[in-house]
């Protein structure tokens, strides 16, 4: 097995030459030892083949360094397995790269870990993919951060799951966005 030092010394071409079998064999220790530049060298094929334990081994800094195409390549179960800290490390552009399948797999803990700016970076399509359970778990702060287009993306069944607390937390502007 490659040491962390040896793995880290591979250039992008060498990392790109790793087979699926080799990628799947990387240990948590090896992945934890990589810096952001090293992680950026993994292809979307490599990323899509990472097991949940491998994804969990990536640091928040490494997660924040993933490209949008790498983010989109993570399996939905892989995204769901991320800690709230790792998930909250995603930038707005990375959150925008999540597929609707990935979004619908998110846990309420992950969604609640996002600040209002990051939560508001979800597209209308992504918000429409949220489950009713996810919608009922959105904080009032994050719900208030959405604009009219984003509110319009919610399906009737999603809106019906809003709690009294969530509705009471909406401003008059937010309420008007629900009715436009």
Residues covered by each model-derived region:
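General marker for long, soluble alpha-helical cores
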Residues: 1-180
């Amino acid at each position: 097995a490659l040491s962390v030092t040896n793995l880290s010394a591979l250039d992008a071409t060498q990392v790109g030459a790793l087979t699926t079998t080799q990628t799947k064999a990387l240990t948590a220790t090896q992945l934890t030892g990589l810096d952001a530049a090293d992680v950026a060298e993994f292809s979307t094929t490599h990323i899509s083949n990472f097991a949940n334990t491998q994804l969990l081994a990536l640091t928040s800094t490494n997660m924040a360094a993933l490209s949008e195409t790498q983010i989109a390549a993570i399996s939905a179960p892989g995204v769901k397995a991320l800690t709230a800290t790792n998930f909250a490390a995603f930038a707005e552009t990375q959150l925008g790269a999540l597929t609707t399948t990935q979004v619908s797999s998110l846990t309420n803990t992950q969604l609640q870990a996002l600040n209002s700016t990051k939560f508001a970076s979800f597209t209308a399509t992504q918000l429409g993919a949220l489950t009713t359970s996810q919608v009922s778990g959105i904080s009032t702060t994050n719900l208030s951060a959405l604009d009219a287009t984003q509110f319009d993306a919610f399906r009737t069944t999603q809106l019906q799951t809003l709690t009294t607390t969530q509705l009471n937390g909406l401003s008059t502007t937010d309420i008007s966005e629900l009715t436009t």
